[in-house]
């Protein structure tokens, strides 16, 4: 039997709280990959292991606002 995936996917909302100035280029690219490029911007993303890894990499620059 095949298992059906639920229609609603888990999401996570992140807000940028730190500046990418004077940071490593890889951290800047990670912020861009998350869709964050300016202070206080928020973005709702699909909660996947890849996104969680990106959030962990720049945890000092972002804040998790909501997990749904």
From Swiss-Prot:
* GO-annotated biological processes: translation
Q: Which GO terms describe its molecular function?
A: structural constituent of ribosome
Q: Compositional bias (Polar residues) spans? A: 8-18
Matches recorded under SUPFAM superfamilies: Ribosomal protein L30p/L7e
InterPro entries associated with the record = Ribo_uL30_ferredoxin-like_sf, Ribosomal_uL30_bac-type, Ribosomal_uL30_ferredoxin-like
Where are the annotated segments for Disordered?
A: 1-26
Q: In which domain of life is the source organism classified?
A: Bacteria
Keywords for the protein's UniProt record, in alphabetical order: Ribonucleoprotein, Ribosomal protein
Q: Does the keyword Ribonucleoprotein apply?
A: yes
GO cellular component annotations of the record? cytosolic large ribosomal subunit
Task: List the PANTHER family.
Answer: LARGE RIBOSOMAL SUBUNIT PROTEIN UL30M, MITOCHONDRIAL RIBOSOMAL PROTEIN L30
Q: What family is it from?
A: Belongs to the universal ribosomal protein uL30 family.
User: Which HAMAP family does the UniProt record give?
Assistant: Ribosomal_uL30_B
Subunit record text = Part of the 50S ribosomal subunit.
What protein name applies here? Large ribosomal subunit protein uL30
Source organism (scientific name) = Parvibaculum lavamentivorans (strain DS-1 / DSM 13023 / NCIMB 13966)
The lineage, from the top, is:
Bacteria, Pseudomonadati, Pseudomonadota, Alphaproteobacteria, Hyphomicrobiales
Q: Which gene encodes it?
A: rpmD
């Amino acid at each position: 039997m095949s298992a059906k995936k639920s229609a609603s996917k888990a999401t996570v909302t992140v807000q940028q709280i730190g500046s990418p100035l004077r940071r490593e280029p890889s951290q800047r690219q990670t912020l861009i990959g998350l869709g964050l490029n300016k202070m206080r911007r928020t973005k709702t993303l699909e909660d996947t292991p890849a996104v969680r890894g990106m959030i962990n990499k720049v945890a000092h620059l972002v804040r998790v606002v909501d997990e749904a």
